[in-house]
Amino acid sequence: MMSAGGTYISTASVEVPQALQDGEKFIRWDDDSGTGTPVTMRVDAKGFFLYWVDQNNELDILDIATIRDVRTGQYAKRPKDNKLRQIVTLGPQDTLEEKTVTVCHGSDFVNMTFVNFCCTRRDIAQLWTDGLIKLAYSLAQLNGSAIMFLQKAHTKLCLQVDKSGRIPVKNIIKLFAQNKEDRKRVEKALDVTGLPSGKVDSISVSKFQFEDFYNLYKYLTQRSEVERLFDSIVGNSKRKCMSIAQLVEFLNKTQRDPRLNEILYPYANPARAKELIQQYEPNKFNAQKGQLSLDGFLRYLMGDDNPIMAPSKLDLCDDMDQPMSHYFINSSHNTYLTGHQLTGKSSVEIYRQCLLAGCRCVELDFWNGRTEEPVIVHGYTFVPEIFAKDVLEAIAESAFKTSEYPVILSFENHCNPRQQAKIANYCREIFGDMLLDKPLDSHPLEPNMDLPPPAMLRRKIIIKNKKKHHHHHHHHHHKKPAQVGTPAANNKLTTANSVDAKAAQQVGLSASHEDGGVTRSTANGDVATGTGTGSAAGTAGHAPPLQQIRQSSKDSTGSSDSDSSSEDESLPNTTPNLPSGNEPPPEKAQKETEAGAEISALVNYVQPIHFSSFENAEKKNRCYEMSSFDEKQATTLLKERPIEFVNYNKHQLSRVYPAGTRFDSSNFMPQLFWNAGCQLVALNFQTLDLAMQLNLGIFEYNARSGYLLKPEFMRRSDRRLDPFAESTVDGIIAGTVSITVLSGQFLTDKRANTFVEVDMYGLPADTVRKKFRTKTVRDNGMNPLYDEEPFVFKKVVLPELASIRIAAYEEGGKLIGHRVLPVIGLCPGYRHVNLRSEVGQPIALASLFLCVVVKDYVPDDLSNFAEALANPIKYQSELEKRDIQLSVLTDEAEALGSADEDLSKSFVFVQVGGQKKELRPVESLATSPKHRPSISAAAAMSVDVTVDRTDGGRGEDSISIVAPSIQHQHSLDQSVSTSIRQVESSQFDVDLVLAEPLEKILDHKSVKEKRLEMEKKLESLRKKHDKEKIKIAGQKSSPLEGKKPKFAITNKLVKRLSNKSLNCLSPHSEPGVEIPACPLDLGDSSEESAAADAGEDLAGGSSSLDGRTQESRLRSACREYTSQYRELQEKYHEAIYSAAEKVLKTSQTGQTKQLKASLDKVTGEVMHQLQEARRNEVKNLATVHRDRDELIRMKREVASSVVERGVAERVRLKQTFDRRTDELQKQHDSVRNALAEHRSKARQILDKEAESRSCVSSNGFLVLFHGPHHHGCTGSGSSALSGNNLTLNLDAGAAGSHSAISPAKSHNSIAAAAEMKT
């Protein structure tokens, strides 16, 4: 029996009680047949099978490994039929329940089969109950060697005898093969090993000992790879036997873990080698001489002394006296569900199954029951309800059968105060001493105080529910609405997938009755109708109306944990009183109600609050407060604040649950959040996808306690761990793992093509997926030889958090079996790995033969340099880098999970232009890899998707996806299907919005206005300086007053240069870039002035002096002009591009809103179409079906079908919206980058032009240069245009005219004019 305070889990060798071997008389019964059958029930000597024989000698056999639970007494099944109860009642003593043994078995957590047996006495029933469940949860049996599983197969053959007590040969053939060719192989092997091989032959049990079966196994598998290994060890020995010295060397160099301490784990010595030879060598002569033959060597490799995992890892190996926040805790999400989030079923049984599997945190979603009995139901869906009391009783009965460590009940409470009080009373009555209703004296609820350790909370149930804080009502009730503790005000994280929630809400409303009543599934599947009135507390609305789909547990980030735990936070979330007859707003309807005093009194160490910030949590340091995040919010925190997230989880609990879009109850990869130290990573246990397989594999260790101690760097406050670390962390010894897949044995009884994949999960730097895969061995599931090169995981940064998953697949992608093995505890050397099913049960004889090498990581010379060259990710921004790192755990999670199933189910025919092109997965057309929700509902319907593609004017391709449709055998199919096809046509698709190009942005009115304003200012400045220069040129500089000026312009340049002939680009600037405006600046430098002065040779002394004086004044005016011109240019350069950026931002924001408006519009049209289809169908049904019950049933089907189809359409439109949003965002980014590049180039051009322009005089001319080669330019007394240079005549001739320069720019052209009249 289970000892007090103990569990049925054990790592000890199996000992089957003699009473179970001898057998006992029972009456087997089931309610379906209504009959009771006397049987004799037994267990074989090795504890593999439970079997019973009836009076006709008919045998039934049950694999004990598939047994999930065994019950007697209060929780055993009881016959419903009175007559059957009388038949099965034996003996006058004890009640029927106390004499009943109910055996529960199944291949997953949902589909359970119950077998019931009644005996004569209570003690007999108790003995069998305890004995069977202890065998079922024996870790020694679960992790047995390859030899043990051979013994199990042999035992089954020996039990399945015919009426004459002999073993039919056909049973042996059937065990190994189904295919005709493989059956011939088995028949030949039987013949060669001296056994009967005919199909109708049989074998005496006494002549079919285990040795005979083992010889048959050897012949079928050949094991040539083991023979090669053996030869490499013994060399050219004539006897082909391994000596003691050779065995010692093999044990120490190949089979020993080099990471182990030599004192605690000493090397093998000759004495140890002799023990192994004595144990495994079948030839006594060899054993006496200390020699090991090939047969003995194979037996050792398959034996108990050569496990793949260190036996200590299976036992309770972790320190259980650390604070609870230092452990990963096996957690379940939406525990009550057994399938789909919208249309699945609820179950009391699955609570038992999750707890028995080691789950230590389950979720209960309470709602008001119609009969004043609180119920558990998935709010606002078609999922039927179950009574809360039944669930609490199931938890009390199963919580500590397989683990004695504390269980957390995560309440999501929507009940009114009266029913909340009833729940609290049930908890006290049903749980009794197991309920932790007050904190421990050693760990008070105070800041800076750690949580108690699991060891102190053995066999305790902890309630997680909102905590009532009375002082909030007195201090904050006068605050403005914006200050009230709503998610928008208090929480920086928003509830994910509001679009999907709104979608589901509208679908639900569309399925409601015309008169305002709302349909709701009840426990027995009927649909109840109600007005749905009442406040948020639910005082009138007893059960949740079908208004909207609850997206997920809103523990903190949504609305459920709106109570804060201190005065510095805000009010509990309450709903204002509503006018009579009005329903609360949908977004309020799903919120949790305020915690009642009775249930609040039960809450202590797990108090959910809104998450505000890591800084706030660190400042308060209340370890008893915890927050919950959906997977998207947690991923955001992980990417943006990884180190802070890890530090937060050192002291406080955090719960991460699947996003609300996972209607099919799929899971995210839990490794993603284990990397951040999140303790309660909650998964949908009903879905055995890749994520759940990994979860089950990891929590199998530490005695399946449900608690795994986190690595030291995730616990110590004085240590820092970055989950995105790529290099070795100081203080952590990195590891290297190498795995060679050599062969497989009996992977499948089909003649299949098989391959093996080896993946590693851990930190992003350690995670390797879909990289290592063996070749495909064709037509051989019996003994495939892979003999691959080693799969090397060169550097494992954090081995304590890393695990290996080895999986065998059929060529089509169907999972054969897998195994999850933590790197810490992995045994090196040549090892057999027995494969498991998705739920973690052993698969008959299926095993892989591996060569494993584990060692500490030693970097190669210059490895860091080589890594930097080969890994450009290091030079990206941190967020981009983390996105890429996380992709190995997020992008492919759902795709890989579906690969474990038959891939043919995930593929559909794709038609392009009316022709069948190829077979392609649905997701590849439905969504982008980055946002790929796993929606099986969408795949369960007939969906036509039209994809518009602009392709050089070649028109559009219509892509039709044909998936399995929901099977409804009434006219709804036709009407709604027609409606769906209309809804899904292109006219109801989300509009395609294209980003405005840069040219349109720069051509916008506000940008043009700025450009025109600049041109006017520059023109005004030019005119001002023209006047100044004319004034200077007209002043008398010579003592010869009264004479005509001697300066006369000899050439007049009035040619205006258009933008095409002369723009502001320098000779070295890039073509095609125009800046808004740039004047012809007249640069000046001392060198240029000196060169000009040296080069001038003006005729006459007085006139020469006058010319120089006048030129210096002109040059001074030119400098002032150039300076002011440049200032204006700088000012408007910024103004023009700021205006362009504003236009761009406004345009892009408007386009995003336009896309969202398009989604809302088309969604409304979709809902309208569905509602119209439903109304029409209901009218049609009323005319066709006269039977009232049939009519009600058909209406239910209509409502259910519309909801499912509506959700699928919502999902499709949302996916299209997300895809087009992503595309639009990329276009926006491209335009923003183009504008920035345009701005930068314009700046470069301005700077180059400023440097290259100059104003010098040469041979009587003032030359305005635009290029850097002006020193070689000469004038000849005439106007010239050479390249970008303007030459103006300034010669002081007899005409005596004054000179002036007039550079100007108007409307993107440069005009230079100089004119003076005498």
Curated annotation (Swiss-Prot):
Catalytic site: H333, H378
Annotated C2 domain residues: 715-843
Domain PI-PLC X-box: residue ranges: 318-466
Gene Ontology MF terms: calcium ion binding; phosphatidylinositol-4,5-bisphosphate phospholipase C activity
InterPro entries to which the protein is assigned, alphabetical: C2_dom, C2_domain_sf, EF-hand-dom_pair, PI-PLC_fam, PLC-beta, PLC-beta_C_sf, PLC-beta_PH, PLC-like_Pdiesterase_TIM-brl
EC number: 3.1.4.11
Name under which the protein is recorded: 1-phosphatidylinositol 4,5-bisphosphate phosphodiesterase classes I and II
Recorded GO CC terms: cytoplasm
A Pfam family recorded for this sequence: PLCB1-4-like_EFh
Biased composition, class Polar residues, residue ranges: 571-580
Biased composition (Basic and acidic residues): 585-594
Top-rank taxon, per record: Eukaryota
One record GO biological process: phosphatidylinositol-mediated signaling
Tissue: Expressed in neuronal cell bodies of the optic lobe, central brain, and thoracic ganglia in adults, and the brain of larvae.
Gene encoding the protein: Plc21C
Function recorded in the entry: The production of the second messenger molecules diacylglycerol (DAG) and inositol 1,4,5-trisphosphate (IP3) is mediated by activated phosphatidylinositol-specific phospholipase C enzymes.
Biased composition (Basic residues): 466-481
Stretches the record annotates as Disordered: 466-489, 505-594, 1080-1112, 1296-1318
Catalytic activities: a 1,2-diacyl-sn-glycero-3-phospho-(1D-myo-inositol-4,5-bisphosphate) + H2O = 1D-myo-inositol 1,4,5-trisphosphate + a 1,2-diacyl-sn-glycerol + H(+)
Record key words, sorted: Hydrolase, Lipid degradation, Lipid metabolism, Transducer
Chain residues that bind substrate: K464, K466, S628, R655
Chain ranges of the PI-PLC Y-box domain: 599-715
Biased composition (Low complexity): 528-543, 554-563, 1088-1107
